[in-house]
From Swiss-Prot:
D-proline binds at residues 226, 281, 311. Interacts with BSN (via coiled region); the interaction is direct and inhibits DAO enzyme activity. InterPro entries: D-amino_acid_oxidase_CS, DAO, FAD-dep_OxRdtase. Disruption phenotype: Knockout mice exhibit heightened anxiety and enhanced short-term memory performance. Increases the level of D-leucine, D-alanine, D-serine, D-arginine, and D-isoleucine in the brain. Increases the level of L-tryptophan in the brain; the level of other L-amino acids are unchanged. In a model of ischemic stroke, RNAi-mediated knockdown of the enzyme by intracerebroventricular injection decreases the ischaemia-induced infarct size. Does not disrupt sleep or circadian rhythm. Long-term spatial memory is unaffected. This is D-amino-acid oxidase. It catalyses: a D-alpha-amino acid + O2 + H2O = a 2-oxocarboxylate + H2O2 + NH4(+); D-alanine + O2 + H2O = pyruvate + H2O2 + NH4(+); D-cysteine + O2 + H2O = 2-oxo-3-sulfanylpropanoate + H2O2 + NH4(+); D-dopa + O2 + H2O = 3-(3,4-dihydroxyphenyl)pyruvate + H2O2 + NH4(+). The gene is Dao. Expressed in the kidney, cerebellum, pons, medulla oblongata and the cervical, thoracic and lumbar regions of the spinal cord (at protein level). Expressed in goblet cells, enterocytes, mucosal contents and villous epithelium of the small intestine (at protein level). In the epididymis, expression is higher in the caput region than in the corpus and cauda regions (at protein level). In the thoracic and lumbar regions of the spinal cord, expression decreases in male mice with age (at protein level). Expressed in neutrophils of the spleen following infection by S.typhimurium (at protein level). Phosphorylated in the cerebellum; probably not by PRKACA, PRKCA or PRKCE. May be S-nitrosylated, which partially inactivates the enzyme. It holds the Pfam family DAO. The lineage of its organism: Eukaryota, Metazoa, Chordata, Craniata, Vertebrata. The keyword Transferase does not apply.
Length: 345
């Protein structure tokens, strides 16, 4: 069975690994991963990696399930020898609001979810309500190299090439896995897919131990300041620009992030800036995770689409990888059935 995976962010690599681990032992797979960007140059590398879905219920209930599956999988890996290399760790912190809001759908997924006490709220005078919980941190800059190593150990080939069309890789391939994120629209028109530009500042601030996410409904999602400590640096953010394709770091956005994060946590004024990155979240009303049979002139192929994970790719990736593997299994079953001789009963 010949498989072409397009895209080498967290979605492409995890989907490839999940499928290879599940089916290669019984159905030898010849798998290639095509991408014009591999780690450390993917959108996933820019992400701070905090496991937290959006606050509102997803339009597709399956997305809540996929996020939960990802949390459960990562939690099961937490005490494995691989956790440190994966960039996986527990992390606790705050979600802050101006006014009281309903509890999120994921409150029972995370550990120790509770409302903030009045004395805790005194720490954040600009906010009137909040939550505290323990979650998981999965840093893309560690996790993507770890996934890549697992795949190459299994004999999966990585091909550094920009794929211009699905037809380009269809010849001689049984299944195409489309994990191209925000660039999926270049391979197949998708009016629902848009870039959600983000910009972050990375600082050295080892005294910051808790994440702090703020939420302002009037500004929209991701447009409020957030602070997420990682293993080596702290990520500062708060930019979400729908439809903006500019890959350049913006001085204006830098100033917005710096001013708002320093107001939220004044000790950051003493932090040394060590990096600044811009990336594009693949924004869609819901994840596209489905099969499609495509014909390309004389050739044809099964396609599994897995893209449109917005700003929560690391939060939902393994659940989506398992669902893509389920779809792949159905393709295998159908191919086996089609090869069976006709019954003469």
């Amino acid at each position: 069975m010949r498989v072409a995976v397009i895209g080498a962010g967290v979605i492409g690599l995890s989907t490839a690994l999940c499928i290879h681990e599940r089916y290669h032992p019984t159905q030898p797979l010849h798998m290639k991963i095509y991408a014009d960007r591999f780690t450390p140059f993917t959108t996933s590398d820019v992400a701070a990696g905090l496991w937290q879905p959006y606050l509102s219920d997803p339009s597709n209930p399956q997305e809540a399930e996929w996020s939960q599956q990802t949390f459960d999988y990562l939690l099961s890996c937490l005490h494995s020898p691989n956790a440190e290399k994966m960039g996986l760790a527990l992390i606790s912190g705050y979600n802050l609001f101006r006014d009281e809001v309903p509890d999120p759908f994921w409150k029972n997924a995370v550990l120790g979810f509770r409302k903030l006490t009045p004395s805790e709220m005194d720490l954040f005078p600009d906010y009137g309500y909040g939550w505290f919980n323990t979650s998981l941190l999965l840093e893309g800059k560690s996790y993507l190299p770890w996934l890549t190593e697992r795949l190459t150990e299994r004999g999966v080939k990585l091909i550094h090439r920009k794929v211009e069309s699905l037809e380009e890789v269809a010849r001689g391939v049984d299944v195409i896995i489309n994990c191209t994120g925000v660039w999926a629209g270049a391979l197949q028109a998708d009016a629902s897919l848009q870039p959600g530009r983000g910009q972050i500042i990375q600082v050295e601030a080892p005294w910051i131990k808790h994440f702090i996410l703020t939420h302002d409904p009037s500004l929209g999602i991701y447009n409020s300041p957030y602070i997420i400590p990682g293993s080596k640096t702290v990520t500062l953010g708060g930019i979400f620009q729908l439809g903006n394709w500019s890959g350049l770091n913006s001085v204006r956005d830098h100033n917005t992030i710096w001013k708002s994060c320093c107001k939220l946590e004044p000790t950051l004024k003493n932090a040394r800036i060590v990096g600044e990155l811009t990336g594009f979240r693949p924004v869609r009303p819901q994840v596209r995770l489905e099969r499609e049979w495509l014909h390309f002139g004389s050739s044809s192929a099964e396609v599994i689409h897995n893209y449109g994970h917005g700003g929560y790719g690391l939060t939902i990736h393994w659940g989506c990888a398992m669902e893509a593997a389920n779809l792949f299994g159905k393709i295998l079953e159908e191919k086996k059935l089609s090869r069976l001789p006709p019954s003469h009963l």
